[in-house]
Amino acid sequence: IIYKNEIDNYYNLKKSGIINETEIFIQNYIKPVEVIIVGAVHIAQYLIEFLKDLNFDVTVIDPREYFITKQKFQNIKIINKQPEEFFKKIKTSSNTALITLTHDPKIDEPALKHALKQKFFYIGALGSKKTHENRCRRLKEDGFNDEEINSIHGPIGIKLGGKSAPEI
């Protein structure tokens, strides 16, 4: 293709436009940002409202049936499975973000491993600094390198000094 470099440039920059001095118009169709939240905890309810306001596609995964209720989580995808089961059945992309909220390594870490392997654009994990240190140590023991592990934002959140779900 004569204009391969120009087409690649538009694609990589995720923009649309006319290639200089031609009549070729490039239109990029960008998949919406998808945010996968692991953990149907009280914090998730507030986070979901924020993400929906940004027009992100939101999916909540939690294998614990008593946390997942349609009353708590309306108008979003709710998956009552272990994260590794869910990730086997869906396709994710570089437009996918992961936020883990359960504090349970048996639930959070399989999702984190998948996100690291698939190079999600954002990976965040809730928990204390000590919890995050332990999480990183276990991931390193499982073969992930420092660069991969350092791509996990953790502990996530902004220190406002509060303890309520919206503040967390």
Where are these regions (language model features)?
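Short amphipathic alpha-helix with an adjacent loop that forms part of the alpha/beta core around
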Residues: 84-94
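General small-molecule cofactor/ligand-binding pocket signal
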Residues: 59, 79, 153
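Adenosine-phosphate binding glycine-rich loop
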Residues: 126-168
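Segments forming oxygen-rich coordination pockets for charged ligands
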Residues: 1-63, 67-76, 93-96, 131, ...
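Cytosolic regulatory regions of ion transport systems
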Residues: 75, 106-113
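ADP-ribose/adenylate-binding Rossmann-like module
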Residues: 61, 97, 102, 113-138
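Short phosphate-binding/catalytic loops that engage adenosine nucleotides
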Residues: 56, 120, 144
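Conserved SAM-binding strand-loop segment of SAM-dependent methyltransferases
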Residues: 76-82
